[in-house]
Amino acid sequence: MDLICMYVFKGEESFGESIDVYGDYLIVKVGTEFLAVPKKSIKSVEDGRIVIGEFDEEEARELGRKWLEEKSKPVTLEELKSYGFGEEGE
């Protein structure tokens, strides 16, 4: 089941938007922050919306920061070449 690009609600309240799945976590953009919400806290998924229950928000913020750092690392030329980029001019 695809959980990306869906509105996330905590109970009846709008919470954020899902942008990635990171292991056992759903990455949710909440304002300017990224939270790693445990997938086990998902209560339902239907009609383009995800409803979540309670979870440790401080831990979710910390894991969200780690996710952002990992996703923001620069890519080396060798990594680009391993994916087939940069070989056109050679």
Curated annotation (Swiss-Prot):
InterPro entries xrefs: DUF5749
Q: Which Pfam families match?
A: DUF5749 (PF19023)
Q: Which residues form the signal peptide?
A: none
Name this polypeptide is given: Uncharacterized protein AF_2094
Give the originating organism.
Archaeoglobus fulgidus (strain ATCC 49558 / DSM 4304 / JCM 9628 / NBRC 100126 / VC-16)
